[in-house]
């Protein structure tokens, strides 16, 4: 029997908790982009977490999911998305979609999103969760995130939600010149979340957005699964 990863009703959450709690946390983390804040407000995280953790859906904390993974803390997702400086017209690649919450935020701030995750059960759950929220401009597929999704390239922006000491070469190749990429750089544990830009000479670091702890990037261009 397939394990149900995230299929809770928003009504199952205590009435005192709501997306506005996360909006306050995101503001407190320094995010000022109103489009990102509106996306957080419009996206019920309770629809994207395992049933066992729904009581914590509107706390600004990572939540454990299958395969030893955790969801990205909402304020950290918002910080990374703000770093991409999306205007609503971008074609975005997301590496590490999890259960789809960050995918939903991206879908509400970009033109469309292609998400990729290594585990089929997570991808199935993310697709269900996004469909229940009526989000139709996001596609999530199974794959090795470090290899990107070449058939939908080039991308205007890439967001990587797992750590590795370098940016995988396929992600650089699939990023449009002038495009932006955000990735935690490190071995998994405590990383610099770095904003890069692709220029005529290659991928150049522009800014360290924050420090944070991430799971490791697995796959051909990451750590062995």
Go through each PLM region and give its residues.
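Conserved nucleotide-cofactor-binding alpha/beta core module
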Residues: 85-205
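Class I SAM-dependent transferase core
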Residues: 2-95, 101-105, 109, 122-136, ...
């Amino acid at each position: 029997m397939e394990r149900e990863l995230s299929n809770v009703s928003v009504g199952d959450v205590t009435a005192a908790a709501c997306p506005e709690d996360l909006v306050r946390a995101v503001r407190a983390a320094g995010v000022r982009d109103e489009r990102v804040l509106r996306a957080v407000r419009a996206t019920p995280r309770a629809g994207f977490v395992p049933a066992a953790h729904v009581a914590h859906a509107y706390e600004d904390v990572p939540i454990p999911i299958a395969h030893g993974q955790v969801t990205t803390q909402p304020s950290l997702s918002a910080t990374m998305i703000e770093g991409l400086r999306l205007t609503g017209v971008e074609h975005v690649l997301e590496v590490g979609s999890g259960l789809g919450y960050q995918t939903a935020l991206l879908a509400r701030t970009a033109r469309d999103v292609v998400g990729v995750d290594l585990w089929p059960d997570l991808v199935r759950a993310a697709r269900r969760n996004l469909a229940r929220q009526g989000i139709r401009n996001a596609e999530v597929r199974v794959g090795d995130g470090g290899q990107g999704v070449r058939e939908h390239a080039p991308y205007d922006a890439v967001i990587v939600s797992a750590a590795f000491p370098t940016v995988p070469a396929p992600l650089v190749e699939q990023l449009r010149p002038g495009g932006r990429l955000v990735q935690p750089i490190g071995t998994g544990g405590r990383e610099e979340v770095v904003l890069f830009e692709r220029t005529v000479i290659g991928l150049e670091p522009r800014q360290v957005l924050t420090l944070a702890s991430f799971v490791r990037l697995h796959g051909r261009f990451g750590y062995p699964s």
